[in-house]
């Protein structure tokens, strides 16, 4: 086996380890919550509660804590309004008009539980995750409104493309408030509109706030290479995508202003996000942490709109958009710039997006993500064939030099400096780059990493079947057949390479496929399928290059001879 290939395999392994270390830095282990002493309220209750935002008046509208809303028990069924569309099952609490539950009927929890949809938002206290919105008064205090609705259940019927849920209520200061949610068919974006009618004799000042309140979820026990980001994030024209891990929010609250933008909570494949209604206005983004003694902390992230001024007898309106659903680029990109970056393709995001576009185009034809991975991999190998052929020919030339290098070793004995000078002189004379076999292959490594992220992070591959026993390309092969095939493909690839006279390299020839088989045994089936295809195509390319090497060398000699004659 050629030493260059050993180096390449080691580099790939080291890159995988580097990915793990980078992930550890981005998503460190969950810190234990700091114990806090809870003070009883006036009625003696101990509030395991979060604090909605309160905003001081003025341009900056800094956030501060004020008031509490207890979350010691589940929201009463009597206060809930249910909304069902073709893609969302939502529950709205009439106290405040907040969305306290959101399920995705088109995305089952697992193939074994097809009737149980993924639930993103939840009002359960131990897994609190709700999308809130409301109004503040002129003093920056949140106003809680008890809303009413014409119906308790809303359903998007067949042939209906839009569903409107209107809530009405009166604020303590006398304002008539109408809160309207608009749902659309095949859409995870929910449009929120607030209409304020000032029936009092005094002018009213206030703002719209929207926020996501979430108790830190338990750490998922994944193998390191399928660990995805779980936490908050935000975007702005200055920084299209910024991760806000729970650890960073523990250290420092968000307190900044930005024109347009967005704020979100992410998990693997899914997210919830608030997007301001008017991209030309400047909003204040904030966060705060509610410590808990016996449970994980609660994290609040959101934004508040510029202040509205409503004269007596007048009315005003403001709006925002809530997205609760899968991380699908074309849906997210249309809502806000940078929101599609929540598909965590890592530092090679542009390459990953290009690869996913190609993968999707192939899938549009073949309707199977497994075959799409295979065909896309073949296309990639065709594009990089020039680099691969150059690498194979360089390794072939190095093998041709082995007898002459061995002769140099015998001539110079233990004089390493003389041997090094003689070897480099030989390379210079024969116009050989000793790294020529590695560098063309290394150019392809970023593509491998980018494709890795595509397979790991693309929700389209979640629970996507291939053939026979592969029912989900996003999880490991349950029978470990693909990793074994991958190991055999590595052996076949190495079999084409002439055996090295070095006994150590001969041992490595047999050890490396075993190591990589074990290394890949828990990889998602889609990623192993890509690696198998890559190995098979590369083996065929190497076979072809080896077969045509002598004729290629003869052509080069003839070309050089013609140049010398000129």
Curated annotation (Swiss-Prot):
One of its GO terms (biological process) is protein transport. Keywords: Cell inner membrane, Cell membrane, Chaperone, Membrane, Protein transport, Transmembrane, Transmembrane helix, Transport. The keyword Zinc does not apply. CDD domains: 5TM_YidC_Alb3 (cd20070), EcYidC-like_peri (cd19961). One of its GO terms (molecular function) is membrane insertase activity. One of its GO terms (cellular component) is plasma membrane. The chain crosses the membrane at residues 3-23, 346-366, 369-389, 436-456, 509-529. It holds the Pfam family 60KD_IMP. It is found in: Cell inner membrane. It is a multi-pass membrane protein. InterPro entries: Membr_insert_YidC (IPR019998), Membr_insert_YidC_N (IPR028053), YidC/ALB3/OXA1/COX18 (IPR001708), YidC/Oxa/ALB_C (IPR028055), YidC_ALB_C (IPR047196), YidC_periplasmic_sf (IPR038221). Belongs to the OXA1/ALB3/YidC family. Type 1 subfamily. PANTHER family: CYTOCHROME C OXIDASE ASSEMBLY PROTEIN COX18, MITOCHONDRIAL, OXA1. Required for the insertion and/or proper folding and/or complex formation of integral membrane proteins into the membrane. Involved in integration of membrane proteins that insert both dependently and independently of the Sec translocase complex, as well as at least some lipoproteins. Aids folding of multispanning membrane proteins. Interacts with the Sec translocase complex via SecD. Specifically interacts with transmembrane segments of nascent integral membrane proteins during membrane integration. This is Membrane protein insertase YidC.
